[in-house]
From Swiss-Prot:
Primary location: cytoplasm
Catalytic activity: 7-phospho-2-dehydro-3-deoxy-D-arabino-heptonate = 3-dehydroquinate + phosphate
Pfam families with a match to the protein in the record: DHQ_synthase (PF01761), DHQS_C (PF24621)
Family statement: Belongs to the sugar phosphate cyclases superfamily. Dehydroquinate synthase family.
Gene transcribed to yield this protein: aroB
Note on cofactor: Binds 1 divalent metal cation per subunit. Can use either Co(2+) or Zn(2+).
Keyword Translocase: no
Positions with a binding annotation for Zn(2+): E185, H246, H263
Keywords: Amino-acid biosynthesis, Aromatic amino acid biosynthesis, Cobalt, Cytoplasm, Lyase, Metal-binding, NAD, Nucleotide-binding, Zinc
Protein name, as recorded: 3-dehydroquinate synthase
Main function: Catalyzes the conversion of 3-deoxy-D-arabino-heptulosonate 7-phosphate (DAHP) to dehydroquinate (DHQ).
Length: 350
């Protein structure tokens, strides 16, 4: 078992990483929550696989549990879904002294966290991430949000969980496409902050070799994010480097209506494209983009998409949350493991 402490004064919490942790979720929940009712927000796929077993596991600790399930996919992270969830919580008579659990990938984590931050002006929640992307990235750091038609994560808040429970064995039920989704974010951590992690990923023989070491990889990624979040909770400084590849990535997701490319796949393409642009402008060490592209291809990730001459891309980039008063903070690399913030404008991409 590995435990990381995210130190944020009264908002501090633990990240617990352990194989087969799902058999002990109820016991861990009891260490941070002494209320009565627990509402689990999940999606239909995960509910079919884990819903009943996890519900019983938590009930065995004396809690009253209700499961609320949504349709899988990014389109559930919208305002149209919220009233139905709020009403189910009201029917369950959930109070501010009760608990919400986010059981799922990045979409469920963002959605359930946003619900927790807004229902009754905020109630406690716990993250139980089940996808690689959520385990290494989105479950840690307190960012919760829903999408608008004009872009991703445009309405949200910083709202930290009480606890993050990560069972790497739950990745065994994950379709390969969504494992790849998380690999995009894993590679990102190596790019921005850890040359050692990047070289470790280069050194694995293949994806199966990586999977055998996945607990260690999850820990390293969470530890990098923990450090960045502690130093810059509200994402106004160094934490921004976590958005490497995301400016173009979000634009790609939006252009393809969140259907063709998953978040991690789009970020992988964004990292590759931005590195090539930065090298051409002498803002990144020569050869860096080639190493990134090679590593992405090694793990079966897409590296390019044609968004040239597409006005939608420009509009999507304008809505990027790193676009402040017309100035766009783009995340670039000096070299592998050395991310930095570069202040520019949308014209950077033209």
């Amino acid at each position: 078992m590995k435990v990381l402490r995210v130190n944020l004064d009264e908002k501090s919490y633990d990240i617990v990483i352990q194989k087969d942790l799902k058999d002990y979720f109820g016991e861990y929940i009891k260490t941070v929550f002494d209320g009565k009712k627990v509402a689990i927000i999940t999606d239909d796929n995960l509910n079919d696989i884990y819903g009943e077993a996890i519900k019983k596991n938590i009930e065995n600790e004396g809690f009253e549990v209700e499961v609320i399930s949504v349709t899988p996919g990014e389109k559930s992270k919208s305002f149209s879904i919220l009233p139905g969830i709020y009403n189910k919580l009201l029917d369950f008579k959930l109070t501010r002294s009760d608990l919400i659990i986010a059981l799922g990938g990045g979409v469920v984590g963002d959605l359930a966290g946003f619900v927790a931050s807004t229902f009754l002006r905020g109630i406690s929640f716990i993250q139980i991430p089940t996808s690689l992307l959520a385990q290494v990235d989105s479950s840690v750091g307190g960012k919760v949000a829903v999408d608008l038609e004009r872009g991703k994560n445009l309405v949200g808040s910083f709202y930290h969980p009480q606890l993050v429970l990560i069972d790497p064995n739950m990745l065994g039920t994950l379709p390969e496409k969504y494992f790849n989704d998380g690999l995009g974010e894993v590679i990102k951590y190596g790019c921005i902050k850890s040359k050692e992690l990047f070289e470790k990923l280069e050194g694995f023989k293949n994806k199966e070799d990586l999977k055998e070491n996945i607990g260690e990889i999850i820990y390293e990624c969470c530890n990098i994010k923990r450090e960045l979040v502690e130093n810059d909770e509200k994402d106004l400084g160094e934490r921004m480097i976590l958005n490497f590849g995301h400016t173009l990535g979000h634009a790609i997701e939006q252009i393809y209506n969140y259907e063709t490319y998953s978040h991690g796949e789009a970020v992988a393409i964004g990292m590759n494209m931005i590195s090539k642009i930065a090298e051409e402008k002498d803002l990144t060490k020569k050869g860096t983009a080639e190493r990134i592209e090679s590593l992405l291809k090694k793990y079966g990730l897409n590296t390019d998409v044609n968004i040239e001459d597409n006005g939608l891309a420009r509009e999507a980039i304008k809505l990027d949350k790193k676009n402040l008063n017309g100035n766009l903070n783009v995340i670039l690399l000096k070299d592998i493991g050395e991310g930095y913030i570069y202040n520019t404008t949308v014209e950077f991409f033209e």
